[in-house]
């Protein structure tokens, strides 16, 4: 993987082994889906509410009684990936008609959504040196807009962060969880 890129890999359950396995090659968000351009991702630095923490208060006490599970995990959190999908390279003039540009953008968009659906998505962000494991659950309804007369699709993809946090690029928590079929971490 090069620097300064957003990579996505899809994982599906292998029924024979019970492990999640890569479904094809790792793909670059901006290089492998036509003229898809990253806009933002929300929640990438968020951490979900900690599970396994219990508190009780009693009228006769000034403090809480607290139990913290030593192997506590976070609840999953939502992230929204925003991308702009163009029908041609937005940095170059195009000879395509508006209809052809929109059709090309729609084709690239459908290719991206087809990749995101039906599996778990390992997101690797070279800029932040972080990675996360997502699943696509919600409906997506892109809108059409234009910049300087160039039409594009403005797409917001709501993803669920399975672990409720991101990990450093060198961390193996996600890969180990995938190998164990979603059990343990």
Can you annotate each of these PLM segments?
Residues 1-185:
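Extracellular/virion structural assembly segments
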């Amino acid at each position: 993987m090069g620097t300064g890129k957003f990579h996505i890999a899809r994982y599906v359950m292998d029924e024979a082994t019970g492990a999640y396995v890569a479904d094809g090659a790792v793909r670059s968000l901006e290089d492998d889906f036509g003229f898809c351009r990253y806009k933002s991702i929300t929640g990438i630095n968020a951490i979900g509410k900690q599970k396994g923490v219990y508190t009780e208060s009693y009228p006769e006490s000034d403090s809480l009684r607290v139990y913290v599970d030593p192997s506590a995990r976070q609840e999953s959190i939502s992230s929204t990936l925003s991308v702009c999908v163009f029908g041609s390279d937005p940095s170059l003039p195009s000879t395509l008609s508006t209809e052809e540009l929109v059709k090309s953008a729609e084709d690239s968009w459908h290719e991206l959504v087809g990749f995101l659906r039906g599996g778990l998505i390992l997101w690797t962000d070279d800029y932040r040196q972080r990675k996360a494991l997502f699943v696509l659950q919600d409906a997506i309804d892109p809108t059409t807009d234009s910049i300087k007369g160039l039409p594009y699709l403005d797409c917001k993809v709501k993803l669920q962060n399975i672990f409720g946090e991101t990990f450093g690029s060198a961390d193996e928590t996600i890969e180990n969880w995938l190998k164990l079929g979603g059990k343990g971490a």
